Amino acid sequence: MKSIVTSADMALMNRIFRYDSPEKLPIYYEYGGHAYRGVQEPCRVCREALDANMVRYTVCGRIDESLELRVEITEYGDFAATEFLAFFTNCGNAETKRLRNVRIVDGLIEGEDAALIHGNGDTCREDGYEWFRDAVDEKMTLTPVDGTSCNGAFPYFRIMAKNFGVNIAVGWPAAWIAEIEPATGGAHISIGQARFDMVLRPGETMRTPRVNFLAFAGDETRGMNLWRRWYFSHILPRENGKPLPPKYCLHTFNAGGHPEFTGITTENQISGIDDYLNAGLRPDIWWIDAGWYPCDYDWPKIGTWKPDTARLPNGLAPIGEKCDSEGIQLLLWFEPERVREGTELAIAHPEWLLRRTKADGTRDENSLLNLGDRACCDWVIDRVDSIIKEGHVRVYRQDFNFSPREHWIQNEAENRIGALENLHVQGYLRYWDALIARNPGLWVDSCASGGRRNDLETMRRAVPLHYTDVGYGNHPIKQKQHREMFEWIPYFRAHNMRWDNPDGSYGRENHTPDEFAYYAAMAPSLTDMTEHDAPKEAMALAIRMREIWRKAAGRMLDGDYYPLTECRKSNEDFYAMQFHNPDTGSGFFQILSNTCNRKRVFTAKLRAIDDGVYALTAGDGKSRMVVDAKRLREGISFELPRRSSVIWFYEKA
């Protein structure tokens, strides 16, 4: 799409810490009992054009004879955006003095009537994905609760002031902190690693979170769509250099009656693929989740990273080769950071494990693999890389199903607070970077009991195909989740599960997908829960709805997003949204009437519609109409029975 960035947007760069000089950098830290701001002379400044739209300034200086500070500031020329990251390195032969309270950004965002718009992220409960708007009239602290980056506080938030706003994102796959408080002239913001108070050992480097700011003139909706455009341009990973297209996923869940994927065999995977192909359903992704390794049908028994030869005597290669021959990408699940007793890693390398004692005095059954140990990280890189290559894996999926916070805290020294966490984060990112570099075309799916670790540093390398473990088939909960994802992390996946009962309430029993379940799962990627041996009628429905989904998903990735309703997680509401490409004058809107909605008529008032006449086509292609722009803007009404949905595609006639 053509740029919508204006001179008014770019004039706001000075409000988001545009680079001026080393001593005016917004970094703050305390070292040896003294507080410092910026980088003091003497220092070196290097300016590098990363591409036509990005310039990076690297500022290096010495704090004393042993501690070096390097700050990287990136400015974007195609958006009013800045980015900050810093590294501290001990260049000496002895431990440094104490370094603490490091804040990569600590400064003032000028503006009147500031308000903070923020969320609680993925809590792994139904109360997750909530949003709040608070006037900045007292100090507020945002920080996740368990050592993952999105549980209890979402690392994407916004400050709105009079006539403009700033989108802010924290890139730290662990415990970050952001403090926002009122100050003369605006809002003071301070962002860093939540726990950082340590000496650095000789040769050691510690880094800060990476923080991004994107400023915009106008209202929140404009700020949201500028963020989406920036994300698609600069963050979303590409597939072989091309934008990631919609992905349709299939699998054999609970194969052989065993939980998750503990029952997969070479035979049932290949026959499952053939069943779908013979029915006319060709997936983009063939999904193998937890349980393909030796685990005695207990998938959390993790730590032996090799295929279970009892079920997969020739490894994963026959399945991967089958996928390659059919033009399908094989996705494979890993959880490398968790280790259980009795597994290969626990027996061979106990020195790589961080253990913790629970509050009741017993040992946690989960040990944390210390990716901050370079030898450990190298071993995991080599082992997983070999599985990827041997298995023809095209999508690497990583999960993380427990909290690491206490594992770090219980194993750190008094003068090394936050060090294990910091080194682990560095190892985690190095691990992913190595896998991607070694396997051209590989892309990554990020998961942590759903969406607990989807900070921006992670999202530079991955997409969240599984953004939550909550509410797959509870449609109002899913609508609330999608509302946040479309705004901040706009490539994600949904299931077409349905858990609703005949009376419109929701339980946990999953029912066969129907048309409504497909409409409730409109997202850039879809996992179709239609079974590989489903009857012809179910396969026919899947084929029909897949085409509607794919057309809509393409527009989601090529248009601005406009929510047309509030989203309250209520089965009594309408849910509606619009995606619009202003360059082509085309898009679609969807209206969904939830299971207990007493209203029958919804009036859709479309956004961003230029003057002219528009041709509208129903998703199923059975209905068409021609409508002028004035009517679309003022509202066009549709009658829907409860538990139904419509999609209308439109284009300028």
Predicted regions and their residues:
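Flexible loop/turn segments at secondary-structure boundaries
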Residues: 215-220, 256-264, 292-298, 337-342, ...
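Polysaccharide-binding surfaces and accessory modules of carbohydrate-active proteins
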Residues: 1-181, 185, 192-196, 615-627
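Terminal connector regions
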Residues: 214-247
